[in-house]
Amino acid sequence: MNLVLENVNLNSNSGPNSFGQKLFKYMPSLGVSFNNNPEPDAYLCFIESGRPTYNAPLYQRLDGIYFNSEFDYKTQNSNIKRTYELAKGVIFQSQFNKELTFNYFGPHNNYTIIHNGADLNLINSIQNVIIGKYENVWSCASSWRPHKRLSENIRYFLEHSGKNDGLIIAGDVQDKIQHERIHYVGNLGIDKLFSLYKASKYFIHLAWLDHCPNVVVDAMACGCEIICSSAGGTKEIAGSNATIVQEDDWDFSPIKLYEPPPLNFANKTRNKWHVNDDYDMDSVSKKYYNFIKDDLDG
């Protein structure tokens, strides 16, 4: 199969692009070639496309849409929706993502849900960093926008950790909360990030209304126990032993995303929403291949 990856920057480590790198690495073993052949078998577009028409079937990988009422979300969504309507098939990252999109764009008649995957071959080749100073290492990593709730991550750590535990925070943080057991390491390359995860017992991701964060899949694959919010799709891939902080259900109405409500940590439970243990990228890439190939052959 000759497949064109569209709207993917293989030199970027952002969430969608890092997943594109994994597909680019794993799908050739299935007989997939990626090039700019003018007559491909299919296009796989990440999120949205700038093309008005296609000379082969288009499949859309949709990792989220806009719903922040403080912005013109309808305009932000317009080209994503156009791509959605052009697509022969749609791949959603999570059940939450599918329900959100159906609510805003209407149902699609050909779709599947494939959760994100981790590069286990790479993870298994990396040694964990030795952090002997602490009995238990906690970690978190993100692009720290307001809805990622860094301050709540820190509050959870301070209220639930032992006195000999430490929290390592990766990513660019503007307003640092200073504490002797909290350490900021900035943006890390993927090898160092995985090394940190492998040294960590817990990974905190209390982001509000996240879809299917790659950092959580990677941290879980590295052996971390996940702590996350019930709001959004993260709970679907956080593992059966994850701790879930329950929030009010959301009716999909536009909201002020960057003003997340405070969390009540008393409302926490084990993960009863977990639906996926198959996060090996080898298996995930086969799901992508089979969805597209079966549809083309059908």
Regions found by a protein language model. Name each.
Residues Y84, S195-S200:
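Short alpha-helical donor nucleotide-sugar binding micro-motif in glycosyltransferases
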Residues G171-F194:
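Nucleotide-activated donor-binding/catalytic signature segment of Leloir-type glycosyltransferases, i.e.
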Residues V129-K148, I154-E159, L167:
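Conserved donor-binding/catalytic core segment of Leloir-type glycosyltransferases
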Residues A42-E70:
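Active-site proximal beta-strand in glycosyltransferases
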Residues W208:
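Aromatic "clamp/platform" in nucleotide-sugar-dependent glycosyltransferases that forms part
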Residues E225-C228, K235:
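Short hydrophobic beta-strand element within catalytic cores of glycosyltransferases
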Residues F96, G117:
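Carbohydrate-associated surface elements
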